C-alpha cells in the first residue's frame, strides 16, 4: 500500500528509479519529497497544559468582509496583525436639527470601537417637545390648507425649536364657496340672524303675553295628565268590581255543578225502586 505523499512520475535522465524492496530510504530522500508541506511542532503545546497556547494555536483568521465592518483603522486581532499605518478619518456627518453626533468620549484607545460615527436622535421631553415633534412631522391640516387654498401657512425657519408657535394666517373666504373639509369649516358668526331668535325685552307686552301663553299651556298639560290619572284609577276600580262579580259567579256555578252531579248519581237507584214497587203491586 503506497503512502499518500508518494507520486508516480516519469524517470529523468540522470536519476535512478526508486526501489521499494523493503530497504529503508535515507533521511535526505524523504525530506526532499515533502518540501512543499508545512509542519507544526506540537511538543511545546502538548507538554504545557495552558489553555491560552491552545487557543492561540487554533485561532481562526476572520474573513475579510468581517474585518471591513470594523473600519480599516481597527484590526480584528491586535496581538497578531499590525495596525494600518494609514490614518483613517470618518467623513463629516450632516444631521438634521434634531440629531447630533457624539463627541469624544471614553473610547480613546486604538483597539476600541469608536461610537462617534453613530448618530443619536434626541427624543423631545415634556409637552412642549411633543408638540414641536408633532409639528415637524406630517400634518394633515397643512395638506388640507394647501389643497383648498383657503388659508396660508407661514412656517418660520426655526420651526424645529419647540418654543416657537405655529402661525396660521387666514385669508378672506368666499361666501358662496362651501368648505372642502369638515375640519376647515369656518365657525358661524354669532348674530341674531343665524340663531333664529331675537332679543326680547322682559318688560315688554309681547314677552308677558308669551309667558302667559306658556303658563296656560303648562297648566293645561298638567290638568290633562291629572284627568288621565283619575280615569285610570276609575277604570281600575271598575275592573276590580267586575272581577269580584265574576268570582262570585264562578263559585255559584261550581255549587250548581256539584248539585247536578249528586242528582245524576241518585237517579238509577230511584228507577230501581220504582220498578220494584210496580212489580209488587
Swiss-Prot record:
Q: What is its main location?
A: nucleus
Where is it located? Nucleus
Which residues form the Glycyl lysine isopeptide (Lys-Gly) (interchain with G-Cter in SUMO2) crosslink? 121
List residues of the bZIP domain. Answer: 204-267
Keyword tags? Activator, DNA-binding, Isopeptide bond, Nucleus, Phosphoprotein, Transcription, Transcription regulation, Ubl conjugation
Cite the PROSITE patterns for this sequence.
BZIP
Q: Which SMART domains match?
A: BRLZ
Q: Which residues carry this modification: Phosphoserine?
A: 181
- Region annotated Disordered, chain positions: 1-30
Which InterPro entries does this one have?
A: bZIP, bZIP_sf, C/EBP, C/EBP_chordates
- Any single GO CC term annotated in Swiss-Prot or TrEMBL for this entry: nucleus
GO BP term, pick one: DNA-templated transcription
Leucine-zipper as annotated region, ranges: 230-237
Post-translational modification, as annotated: Phosphorylated.
Q: State the oligomer form and interacting partners.
A: Binds DNA as a homodimer and as a heterodimer. Can form stable heterodimers with CEBPA, CEBPB and CEBPD. Interacts with GATA1 and SPI1. Interacts with SMARCD2.
Q: Which family does it belong to?
A: Belongs to the bZIP family. C/EBP subfamily.
- Function of the molecule: Transcriptional activator. C/EBP are DNA-binding proteins that recognize two different motifs: the CCAAT homology common to many promoters and the enhanced core homology common to many enhancers. Required for the promyelocyte-myelocyte transition in myeloid differentiation.
> Entry's PANTHER family?
CCAAT/ENHANCER BINDING PROTEIN (PTHR23334), CCAAT_ENHANCER-BINDING PROTEIN EPSILON (PTHR23334:SF27)
Any idea what this protein is called? CCAAT/enhancer-binding protein epsilon
What species is this protein from?
Ovis aries
